[in-house]
Every structure is written in structure tokens, then in C-alpha cells.
Amino acid sequence: MASAMESDSGGGSGGADAQPPLAEVDGGLARVTRQLLLSGDDPAARLRALMPLELGIFGLGDLAQPVLVRDFLNTLTLMSGHAYPAAVLRHHAYYLLRAASFSRRSFGLGHLEAALDVLASSLPPTTASPATDDPLDGSRLIAETRALAATYRRIIEEGSGEVLAVSGPTATFAFVEELVADTYLARWDAFPREGLSFYAFNAAKTTLGRWLVTVYAETNRYPWAAAGQGQPTAADIKAMAVELVEHSGGGAGGGEGEESGGGGLFHRPESLSSVVASLPLARRRAVEILGVYAEASGGQTPPVAAVPVLAFDAARLRLLEPSGALFYDYVYEALLWDQTYGVPDSVIEAFLAGMAAEMEALAARVQEAAGSRASFSPAAIEQVATVLLSAGLNETVAGDYAMMLASVPRVSRSRWRWLEATAALLESLSGFALHFFRLLPTASPTSRFARVARAAYLRAEAEAVDRRARRTSGPSTPAAAPAATAVGVGAAADPWDAVTPLRIFIVPPPAAEYEQVAGDLSSELLRSLLWVRYSRLWQAPAPAPALPCKPPLLPGEQGRRQWTAAVAAAPRTDVEAYCRSLRAGQTARADPAYVRSPFFPAAFIEFQIWPALRRVLSNELPKTRSLAALRWLVSFGSDLALPSPELTRARRPLELIYATVWEIYDGAPPMPGESPQAVGLRPLNLEGEGKAGDAGAEGAEDEEGGGPWGLSSHDAVLRIMDAVREVSGIISETISASERAAEAPPLAWPTSLFSLLFTLRYSTTAESLGLATRRFLVSGETLSEDISRLTGAAWRLCSRPLLYDAETGRVQIPLATEEEEEAVVAVKEKSVSSSPRHYSTDLQTLKSVVEGIQDVCRDAAARWALATADTATLRRRLLVPALRESRGIADHPLWAHTSEPLRPDLEELNERVEHALELGYSLTGALRRSVAYRFRDYTFARLFQPPAIDAERAEAIVRRDARPPPVFTPAPRRLPQGGADTPPPLSMDDILYLGKSICKALVDVLDHHPAAPETTPIKTYTPAMDLNPEQITVTPRSPSVLAAFARTARVQTHHLVPALTDDSPSPVGQTPPPFRILPAKKLAAILLGNGRNASKRRASRDLSPPPHGRWRAVLDSSPFSFSSSDFSDQDEGEGGEADLRGVPGGGGEGAYEEDRERPSDIDTAARAQKVETSCPRRRSPRTTPSPSRRASGGGGPDRGEAEAHTYPPYLSAAAAASRVRPRTRRGATRRPPRPTAEDE
């Protein structure tokens, strides 16, 4: 039987920040019993033994074993002379049922029935028969639990969408939460039960509009509303595909701005070498259409790499209805990548205006469906989901839009009016939909989902603030500056509040149920631990503790002796001397003569709680002694002391501090609904080496459950600070009321423990992001170096007129003279060209070279854009929520009472990552602006156009001996203007490079050395008809992408904060390095080396790097400490090769050692092989590639395999006919087999 707990293990993306700490303690109830027997009369040891049941869960199967339950109850009976064990024994049925869980094992309803039978047999006969008013009565709880199990069984069998509603003390049971979550999972699994009204389908004016809606609905298996136009059949789907291919593929005819001969739905692939390089969303749309058409016509589906992209023209763009705004992803993708297919700007802006208005209306409908609800509402969740799904927005579509927007530089949004507003609305809607649909499958009023939903809400809030800050501040790079002045309407402010509607997922804590339970507990310690459990499960503050109405009375002779001792209470001076003599964590037994004194609470707070807590916060004690001291402060004298509001208020936050520090060091017991498999490793470790728990693994006690587990929540440090602040107020009140108030030192807390806990919390995140940023920048440098030679050659190729001989079909490419290139004179003499200044090749080879240059450039631009998007996603997922907590820590009121403030360095890390992303976007923009990016489509478009005149008309003109008609008037030569921007002609090295990397046929003539053909004119014509060789002229563009990358980096240096440069000033007269991304001292703080290698007993207060250590060699050789000669100050027009001086990887003495980490798919194979053989050792201590490294190609799977997963399978006609859809809704595969009545 599968457990109900496993059904709640999904949790969406927000679960990483809300995950409870660790796996279940091995041994369960048997281990607790064993530790309880070993505790003896030590109250702190008893507390330690029962802590797994107080804060965690154990397997429900343990309760089904009578021997385990009997041994546990007998052990409690031996300790019933103490108030805490006596209170547990009195309500043992509630105590055990509260922590019981379906757990990781195969426990089902049969085990639950057996457990209830065992507990029923353990109840005393006096309480088993009559009904009592006690809400924690065992027989009452067992009866209510049986009724809940029967209701759950009926709900699951009927499958009507009903959910389990629970109230009273049973709502605090772990397994009841799991049953409730399972009924909600069944409800969301069957959603939507009613048909969806796809209004875009009914409003569509074209076959393409109806096709897009049909593919979306059928692929995701969404039901159609009966009131609509009707669900298309398999024959309808085939007919739509045939019509789109046969009747629309060749052009719409008469479209405004339509290119001659190219106005159809499908355009040629813009890159034949990689499907990633050419508009993936548009290509996927084309694959869907052509795949169904191939099956309908009995043909074969073409290869993905040969499929054209789905395009548009002016006529079709006008016919796209705004109601289907979210179905036109291929249009937005093309516009953001500057692909207009000849459509006029006026048509594009009118289209964008309609789409922006429709998206604003959709956002308003979402807001209306969510309403003003501020807490969990299943009805509102269903309404919002219906609105989003009907409009065409689900989790998959939202993810596609998020990736598309993240991979495109923000400057690309400023070309047309309304494009910025449309992109901003798409960003807000897709971000909201991602959070919404990730929370939907596991939404339930349980503590597990409450933690997930709270983490997701806080993350969405932090992302919205970050997005608003980036939008209002504007880009700081010069290349992106125009975006701030050409923004469309509605882009200045946040277009829509995408955070508030998520409140419908926020689950309010069941405070009333816990109040009812707490009011019936007789032990103050048991009551306090109940509220600690409440705070930990629901991440909500507990109410102020109430004063117990009567002191705890203990049975037997011991109770009489304690009461007699209380009568003869010691005076104040003796009590204070007694409290001074106590040793925290070591004195086991309390003396009733002093503990029951009315002076004991104030003396214990002043002489024990204050100094002991100072020692714990100063990190002077080892982990084990710190936990023991906190346990002792909580439990010492708790069974004997008189009721005291001061001591009760002081011990409650101490219990919370103990539980939180425990889970940070070693991991506390698991919480209800948590999958143990999901918490075995730290969720923030991107490198796969979980060493963050080393601080707690050394010398960990077996009974503490030591192990390398992660944290329970994202605000653990803040919870400790809140608790310390609460204790501070109590200590201040106590000291101010004493006679020594004037002599008491000021209340100040050390910060070493906070520094250590913060280091443990974020060391993995900081180190992973630091390494990812380094690799990202190294990949950018490598890409700039490799692609700059290609863009430089393309620039030089189109900077001079190319001479074409129509009779021989040869093209003469100008080469540099001896004065321009003295180093290649010997190579020139080997050329077979008729002129030493030209290189001869045929026209088809030139076309292949032109196409290859554009393909390689676009492939590099697309891959780098994806790598930049992955880095931006990594920052948004890990760093943005961490920044929110770090800022909360820095602004916490507790720092007003500390010896020195804590300065988290996540702000500096954020600045580094932001600057790296800005440089990444600038590189993407430089690639898009290079001449090679549009080499075929614009620069050499004339080569690929149909001939302007056919042979018959040419012969007629020749026979008539007439001058050419106006159509033959040669176009004016667009030669480059003179000056610094005029590049040198193409060199022979460029020819060899293009022949080796782009088209081998270009240099085949050098190997064969054929003789130049001798041609004799057959006829001669009059001067009026003799035409000079056609000159193919182009407009020059910038050659060097590396120059743009370097110039951006150099200019960016003026905007960097001082934290990004060396702390020491430059010598007088010496120019500081222009670009310094990761200096040694600052990088040391980011890597948090002191958190990794320093003593586990003391954390550094200033987080400064150690003078010596394993990172020193890495820091000293950091590839980002560039010298002033790394980037040339020459202008871009002086040539691309000049900008390559000092670039890493050159193979000389100045080559950077970090070249070993370059991704293999960006560099050449020879370079990769050379690096692999010459650099057997790596400086990086980690060998597993980070996500950003894999995204850029390094260390990932084969390129073909990676690209194969880029596009989902198309919708086949057979699948549509049989209703077997290839894509499954999120959440359907997460459903485990539900618990049944069978007992394994």
C-alpha cells in the first residue's frame, strides 16, 4: 500500500525553500523507548528522548504493534512521578496519534485500523466506557478517527471531488493531514471536470487560429464545453493541417509588405546546423502542422532540422484575433528576435496594441476570479484555473514564455511601440501562471502545503520587487540604454499585480484547534512544546503563554516531600547563590528547597538564562554542549518550580531556539507530509557534494540523529533572532526590577552564532552561484574569441565589391595587398587566382559560405541566449529569495542590542551576478547586430533572389540591339565610406579559416592547383550592350563581437560599486585594471571558505578570508583579474583581429589557466582536445558542471540528444482520432496508489 504521505511529495518549485529538514529517525517508537529508559532521572535527557515525538513523526505501523506500545507506556509509568512524563502518560492516545504518519513505509488504512485497536486496548477501563468532556479523551479520539477513515474511504471510492473536512484535536494529527491532502489531490487530479470554453476558437477568423487552439486543447486533454462550436474530430484536424500546408503555405496573396515569392506560412530554416538556432517555438508550431499533414497524406514526417518555421505576413497578422493573444507565441518570438518577414511597422504596432489590451483584460479577469480573498479558497483556485486554461495559459506555455523572455535582451523590446508593454504583461502573466500551476496539484489545507505556499508567495513577492526595480532603474549598459527611452505604453510601472492573487493558496494555521489542545494539558513544558510544534509546522508565531492556574502536584511520597520543602522556602540571597552555583547542561537534579522559592524565576533568568544564552550565541561551546545547555535551560526544575509568568515566557522562545538550532546543525525529525527521499540531500547544493552538514556531523550524538541534512525552512535564522529578541525583553524586565539594575551591564548579544548559521544556510548557494558566474563569464570570453574571427571575416568579405563573371560563373573576392598584409605574401603566391589581389571561386561556393556564416553566428547567438537565460533563472530561483531573508536579517531590530552588526555579503554576490548578466545580454546584442547574423537574409540577399530576367528576354534584347530596359539599371554601389570604419580586405588567412570551418569547397582549389581556363568571346556587341561584370556590393558592419563585449565591460567598470574592485588603491600614475569581476578578497567572502574549513566551534565575525587556505591558489589565479591590456582601446573599426590581442586561450604565455573550464561545444575540437591533454588537473575543487555550465554546452549530453528534447512530439492524426494524447497534465503522474483496507 502506498502511503498518503507520498502523495504530497510534489510541492512544486516552492518546495525547495520550504522543505523540512531530514529523513525519519531510524527505529521510530522503539528508539524513543530505548532513549527514555536510558534517561533515568535527568529531566534534560527525558526531554531529549521525547523530542522526536514532540517535533516530528514516526511510522503508523509502530502503533499497530502491541509490544512497542506496551513498552513505551510502561517506561512512562516508571517516570510518572515527574510532571512532564505524567502528562504524556495521561493523554498518551493523543500524544501518539499526533505524531503517527503513513510515513515512508507501505502503511495504509488497514494499519490505521490495527493501530486504533491497539490504542483502544491500552486505555484504562474507567475512561473507555463513559463519554467525558475531555477533548483529549482517548476513546473519543479513537471514535473520531474511525469516522474520518470511513469518510475518506467513501470519498476515494466515489471520486466525486469531495474533500475531507476536519476540526477539533484530530486536525493536529499528522496522518489526518495526509488523508486530507490525498482527497484534495484527487480533486485537482480530475480538474477540470467541466468543459472549457475556448473563446479564441469561436472568434478565430482563420484556419490557423482554430488550429492553434485545437492543438493546445487536444495535447493537454482538456474537455470542451458543450455550448461552444464543438470539439474538432480527427478528420477535422487532418483537414485543417492539409489546408494550412496546401492552401496557405505558398502565400496569402496580396499581403501588405509581402516579400515577393516568400509570403507563405512557412519559411526556410534559419539554421540547418542546429534546431536551437532558429526560433524554437515557431519551428515547433511548424512541426505540429507538417507532422499531421504527413500522416494525412500518407507521407513521412520530415526531419526536425529540415522543417521550416511558422511565419506570418501582414495579411495574416491582421486576421489574428486578440482573444487568442496567448496562442501567438511564434509571433512574439519572431518580433523579439527581430524577424519581421517584411511586415510594415504599422501593422506590427497595431497587432501589439490589440494583444496588450487583451492581456490586460485577462489579468483583470484573473484578479476578479481571485477576488479579495486572503486565505485558502478552493473555489477561487478553480475559477482562476478555468480563466487561465481557457485563455491558453498552462504551466508548459508559461514556461515557454518565461524562457523566451529571459533569453532575449531587454533592448530588443524597444523596437516597436507596445512591444515593451506586451512583453511586460507576458512576463507577469507567465510568472503568475508558473507559481499558480506549480501550487495547484498539491493545494490543501495542511501544514505541508502551508509551508510550500508561503515559500512560493514570498518568492513571487521577491521576484516582483526585483522585476520592478530592474524596470524602474533601467539598464545600465550603454548598449541597452535606448530601451529606457523607447518603451511602450504601460511599461514604466508594474503592469499587473501578479502576487496578490496567490493569496488564495495561503493556508491559515489552525490556532483554535491548538488552543483547545493546549488548554487541556497539565504540564507547562508539554504545552510549550506543543506551541513550538505549531510554530515549526505552520511557520506562525505562537500566542503569548498563559499563566498556569495551579502548580503541578506530584503523587506519592516525593510530592509530599516537595510540598514540605516549598513551605520552608529559602531567602532571596540563598536562592541567588544557588542559581549562581548551577552549571548549565551539567546539573541534573534540582533542589526543591530553592526551585519552589518565589525568588527562583528571577534569579534563574538573571544568573543562568542570560549568561548561558550569551555563551551559546557567541559560539564558544561545541555543538553538542550548546544543544545540551539549551535543553537544560528549558527543562531544569520544570516539574518543581512554582507557576511563574516570567519563567514561562522565557522558556518558550528558548525551546524554539533549541528546536531551530537542532534542525540547522543535525536536522530535527521530519514533519507531516514530507517525502523522506526529498530531504536526504541539501536542496541548494548545485554541485552534488553535500558538505554543509559537516559542522554537525563531527561529534554528533547518536540520540540527536546527526547527519548531513538540510534546513527545515528558509527563515530559520530569522526565527532564532525573533526568539532571542523575545528573551531579551524578558531579561531586561527582570534585571530592571532587581536591586542591581544600575550595576548591570548593557544587554548586548554576540553575533558569532548568527554568522555561523547564516554561513551554513547560504554557503552552498553563494559558492554555487559564484562558480556558475565564473563559468558563465569564461564561456562568454571563449565564445567572443571564437566568434569574433568569424564576424571579422564576414565584415571584411562584404567590405569590398565582389566581381562576378556571368560567362564563367566565377566570383573574384578582393584580397589584401602586400602593404596591408605582409605576413601572408608567401601564401598569396600559391594562389591560382588570375590576380594577386583576388581569390577566385564559383558562385555556389560563395552561397554556401554566406549561408554557413549566418548559420554559425545564429547558432552561437541562440546558444548564448539560452545560457544567459539559465543564469538569470538560477539567480531568480536561488538568490532572489535569499536576498529577501538576508535583508530581513540585516534590518532586524535585534541588531540594536548586539555587539557588532552582521553584514551578509549576498548583496555583493547579487551585484556580481547582475553585472555578469548585463555583460551576457550585451554579448547577445552584439551578435545580433553583427553583419554575420543577417549575412544571407540581408547582406547577400541579392544572391538568393530569383533572376531579374530570364534567358528568352535577354536574347530578345540582344537581337534588337537595344539598351536594357529600366529593370536592368544597375543598383547604386553601396561601398563603405572612407575613414576609420573601413576595414582591410579579406586576407588569405580568412579564406583558409572559412574553408576549414564553414565550407571546404572554398579551399579545394588550393589542393588541386588547376590551370585557369582560357575563354574567348564568341560574339562582340556594341558598347551600348557590353555590360561590365556585375558587382555584388554590400553594406559593411561591425566585425568584432569581442570588441563589443570588451568595450561593454570597460564601460561597465565606471558603473561598478567599489565592492567589485580591489580594496587597495592603484599606485600613483598607474591605470587600474578596466574590468575586475571577482577580486580575491571579495570572492573569498562569496565562497565562504571560513564556513567550510574553519573551526566548527567559532565562526568568523567579519567573514574575511583566511590568510592561507585551499582557495588561495584559486583566487590568485582567477581568470577575472584582467590586466589593462586584456581589452584593447582601439575603436571597433580598426579591425577585428586587433581586438583579439591578450585574449585567453591564445596558447602563449598570456593564456589564462581558466581556459581548461571552457565548454567543449563552443570551442573547437582541437582546442578542447589540447586542453584535455595538457591540463590533467583542474583548479576548481568541484568537477560536476553547474546548471549554467551545462546550459552553455559544457559537460552536458550529446548535442543531438539535447536538441531532441527541445521540441515535444507533434500532434499526430492517429493520436487525435483515438483521443490518446501525448502530453499529460501536471499532477496526474504524481498520484500514488491510495491506502486501502488491505493490511500487508
Swiss-Prot record:
<feature type="region of interest" description="Disordered">
    <location>
        <begin position="1"/>
        <end position="20"/>
    </location>
</feature>
<keyword id="KW-0946">Virion</keyword>
<feature type="region of interest" description="Interaction with large tegument protein">
    <location>
        <begin position="619"/>
        <end position="1240"/>
    </location>
</feature>
<dbReference type="GO" id="GO:0019033">
    <property type="term" value="C:viral tegument"/>
</dbReference>
<dbReference type="Pfam" id="PF04523">
    <property type="entry name" value="Herpes_U30"/>
</dbReference>
<feature type="compositionally biased region" description="Acidic residues">
    <location>
        <begin position="1128"/>
        <end position="1137"/>
    </location>
</feature>
<feature type="compositionally biased region" description="Low complexity">
    <location>
        <begin position="1182"/>
        <end position="1191"/>
    </location>
</feature>
<feature type="region of interest" description="Disordered">
    <location>
        <begin position="963"/>
        <end position="984"/>
    </location>
</feature>
<keyword id="KW-1048">Host nucleus</keyword>
<dbReference type="InterPro" id="IPR034738">
    <property type="entry name" value="HSV_ITP"/>
</dbReference>
<feature type="compositionally biased region" description="Low complexity">
    <location>
        <begin position="1116"/>
        <end position="1127"/>
    </location>
</feature>
<dbReference type="GO" id="GO:0044177">
    <property type="term" value="C:host cell Golgi apparatus"/>
</dbReference>
<protein>
    <recommendedName>
        <fullName>Inner tegument protein</fullName>
    </recommendedName>
</protein>
<dbReference type="InterPro" id="IPR007611">
    <property type="entry name" value="Herpes_U30"/>
</dbReference>
<comment type="subunit">
    <text>Interacts (via C-terminus) with the large tegument protein/LTP (via N-terminus).</text>
</comment>
<keyword id="KW-1040">Host Golgi apparatus</keyword>
<dbReference type="GO" id="GO:0042025">
    <property type="term" value="C:host cell nucleus"/>
</dbReference>
<comment type="function">
    <text>Plays an essential role in cytoplasmic secondary envelopment during viral egress. Interacts with the capsid via the large tegument protein/LTP and participates in its transport to the host trans-Golgi network (TGN) where secondary envelopment occurs. Modulates tegumentation and capsid accumulation at the viral assembly complex.</text>
</comment>
<keyword id="KW-1035">Host cytoplasm</keyword>
<feature type="region of interest" description="Disordered">
    <location>
        <begin position="673"/>
        <end position="709"/>
    </location>
</feature>
<feature type="compositionally biased region" description="Basic residues">
    <location>
        <begin position="1220"/>
        <end position="1233"/>
    </location>
</feature>
<feature type="region of interest" description="Disordered">
    <location>
        <begin position="1091"/>
        <end position="1240"/>
    </location>
</feature>
<keyword id="KW-0920">Virion tegument</keyword>
<dbReference type="GO" id="GO:0019068">
    <property type="term" value="P:virion assembly"/>
</dbReference>
<comment type="similarity">
    <text>Belongs to the herpesviridae inner tegument protein family.</text>
</comment>
